[in-house]
């Protein structure tokens, strides 16, 4: 699934641009970075990404995305950061123990808050919300997990900004500083 596609760029391509910069920066700082997708392959978003993450010894999981309203000329803008909200309408398929474990939920919220605040500080982007949802990738992952929506692809001005390499560097700086803040608080 290539995700959203607006103004001649696919979400998957933006995701990979930011991910590669983020991985490089984190590895330079001594972090070990694992990925569910390092090339143009399709990985099932419902359970397979979480299953892959759950088999690793990783501490946290960050899912990188770009947003879209579905409108051709959206005025929506900003960064959204999601952590898991346990909703009984969406029971866990592969993570019955950890999906609503209080420690994991608390750590996910703390990770989301740290990254969100520093993304906003680094980029100057509009705060589109620090939110909780029962997205599968957050529900099925057995460790602290966040999903980042780093800007709106269907807003022409924001689309131009999020595809700019220097702006992507600011996104990466915010994510890295957020991760560092999270670990400093442990």
What does each of the following model-derived ranges do?
Residues 1-8:
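Short glycine-rich His-centered loop
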Residues 9-186:
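Active-site-proximal helix/loop segments of hydrolytic enzymes
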């Amino acid at each position: 699934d290539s995700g959203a596609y607006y103004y001649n760029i696919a979400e998957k391509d933006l995701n990979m641009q930011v991910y590669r910069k983020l991985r490089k920066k984190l590895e330079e700082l001594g972090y070990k970075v694992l990925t569910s997708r390092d090339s143009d392959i399709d990985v099932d978003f419902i359970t397979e990404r979480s299953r892959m993450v759950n088999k690793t010894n990783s501490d946290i999981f960050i899912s990188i995305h770009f947003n879209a309203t579905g409108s051709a000329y959206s005025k929506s803008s900003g960064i959204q950061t999601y952590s898991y909200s346990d909703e009984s309408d969406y029971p866990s398929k592969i993570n019955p123990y950890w999906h609503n474990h209080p420690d994991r939920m608390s750590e996910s919220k703390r990770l989301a808050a740290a990254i969100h605040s520093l993304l906003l500080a680094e980029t100057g982007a509009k705060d589109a919300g620090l939110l909780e949802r029962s997205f599968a990738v957050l529900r099925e992952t057995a460790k602290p997990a966040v999903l980042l929506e780093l800007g709106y692809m269907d807003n022409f001005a924001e689309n131009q900004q999020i595809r700019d390499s220097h702006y992507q560097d600011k996104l990466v700086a915010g994510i890295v500083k957020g991760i560092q803040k999270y670990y400093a608080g442990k």
